[in-house]
């Protein structure tokens, strides 16, 4: 019996040791796990490409909206392509311009497929925003493992600069702009808000804003994980991998990543949506209130006792709570762009 006990303890010791080794390995190198997910998503292709994934389109969609797709906005980084969707073929009509940045944990997603982490169809969301009278610029950006923070924010700035330079060509009003992002894209938008408002933060990221703050009428920040210290292990692995290829970020790296501590009175008016990362949105909401910044938070758990999935607003066609959140969002940005 003692012999068997020793064998069992020996086996348990080996299993525990292997578990510790595995934990240390994946937390220090989360790309080991993220890379496996990417291999299933992209198979033999790469998540980053200097060529567009699809043939360019310049014409009417089935729903009557007009699409110009696969426009290269820079040659500096891969995935530097954007699409522009207009409500109809009257491209010269003066409308607000909304930039949209997709989610995907900085390892997946695209302007065409939306956010693979969200239980929703974000491409419908784009169409429904366009139908409300907005020209929407839908932007792609580079992903891990080749590119890390703050590269996507730099690309965001490049996309805005490109459209500003070509505004007349594409009939886009760059004096009346909304920036919107979901999940990873919401992180970028929240960070860009602090870039616009806070020169020290802009210098920290080495980004010179390509648009004047007064021309950005509103931000829409859809469920952005921002407060690194409060993240679950899974979220730390995704964000840590994006920032520095490890979950063990330095204080300096966390300070650069989290825009909440850099909020001031000049931060743009913001509409916040909270579900999986509602506590982060509550923290941002409080910081904006303290700074005297106009903002509104949609928090279904606090307001209606309902837990909604990540990126829930994109379910507006099938879920009444999402539809109501969408209408509140549109009212918020309409009030700042159409009056």
Where are these regions (language model features)?
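Alpha/beta-hydrolase superfamily serine-hydrolase fold, recognizing
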Residues: 3-339
